[in-house]
A protein has these predicted regions:
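HIT superfamily nucleotide-processing domains
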Residues: 1-110
Length: 110
């Protein structure tokens, strides 16, 4: 999930902030695509509470074509559990990819 530091909604974005958001979306999608078991990245915006902007990045598992379209957020309830070690490895791949263009990887607490 990507969220703003300030409490704003998409309608509050300036053109400059919108341009930065677009660049960040592309960076995250490219980073997630480095994971060899991700077929596609879906980007969604939900939230009906005022001034809370969140984008959700959802990875469709490679080869799971039945997970097309808007139903992807519901599939997590029926998919088999994802391997915990693989999940951590993918998180590291994404973090390292994002850090290549500035920033640093922050290790999660155990």
């Amino acid at each position: 999930m990507l969220e703003t530091r300030d409490h704003v909604d998409l309608s509050d974005f300036t053109p400059a902030l919108g341009a930065q958001l677009g660049q960040m979306i592309v960076r995250i999608e490219h980073a997630m695509q480095r994971c060899d078991d991700i077929g596609r990245v879906h980007v969604n915006r939900w939230g009906d509470g005022g001034s809370h902007f969140h984008l959700w990045f959802m990875a469709r598992p490679k080869g799971r074509m039945e997970l097309y379209g808007y139903g992807l957020p519901l599939w997590y309830k029926i998919l088999p559990p994802y391997d915990h070690d693989r999940w951590h490895a993918n998180n590291r791949i994404v973090a390292d990819a994002l850090a290549e263009n500035g920033g640093r990887v922050i290790e999660a607490a155990s």
